[in-house]
């Protein structure tokens, strides 16, 4: 969030359209809350995984398991199953070559960096539902984007649409978590 503001100020960009997916969507949402004067608009895509109260404990436990797998099995091994997860089925079906490239690039990520991110960012971040008071006061025009098969993000994204006064919601059919890669022309 602060990194986005710093880059804009450093480049003397007074206001920008800011787009983020997944963890980047979460950063974009927080940017809109903390620095509305710097944002022309926001696109918040695939945000809110792990936010639903009834699933929060399992989400945190899964984050620990995945972090350990990154450390013990290595990124290449974990990427084999992570890239093929249920929220990427449509990506593989629509664009097998693009999906294979995604999986290859995922396998090249730092295992240590990924483990630290799971524990220190993903697991530690608050639920979007905990931000309700702030979100109700948000003034930046915001488009919430989600794939209809990105199950962990559907309820949080609907909540964002209902809570942020300036928000619109775009649900892409037959799309999972990687909506930017699955539907690049939109």
Region roles according to the model:
Residues 18-20, 45:
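Short beta-strand immediately N-terminal to the catalytic nucleophile in serine-hydrolase-like folds
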Residues 20, 24, 28:
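Gly/Ala-rich beta-loop-alpha elbow adjacent to hydrolase catalytic centers
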Residues 29-34, 38-73, 77:
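Flexible "cap/lid" loop of the alpha/beta hydrolase fold
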Residues 138, 144-146:
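Short beta-strand/loop motif that positions the catalytic acidic residue
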Residues 151-156:
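Conserved alpha/beta-hydrolase "acid-adjacent" motif
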């Amino acid at each position: 969030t602060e990194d986005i503001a710093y880059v804009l100020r450093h480049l003397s960009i007074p206001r920008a359209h800011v787009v983020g997916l997944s963890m980047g969507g979460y950063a974009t949402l927080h940017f809109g809350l903390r620095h509305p004067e710097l944002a022309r608009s926001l696109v918040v895509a695939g945000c809110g995984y792990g936010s639903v109260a009834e699933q929060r404990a399992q989400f945190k436990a899964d984050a620990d398991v995945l972090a350990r797998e990154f450390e013990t099995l290595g990124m290449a091994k974990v990427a084999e199953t992570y890239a093929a997860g249920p929220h990427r089925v449509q990506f593989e079906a629509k664009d097998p070559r693009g999906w294979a490239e995604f999986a290859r690039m995922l396998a090249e990520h730092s295992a240590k960096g990924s483990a630290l991110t799971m524990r220190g960012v993903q697991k530690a971040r608050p639920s979007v539902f905990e931000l309700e008071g702030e979100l109700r006061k948000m003034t930046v025009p915001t488009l919430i984007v989600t794939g209809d098969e990105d199950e962990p993000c559907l309820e949080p994204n609907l909540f964002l649409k209902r809570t942020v006064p300036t928000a619109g919601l775009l649900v892409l059919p037959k799309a999972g978590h990687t909506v930017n890669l699955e539907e690049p022309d939109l």
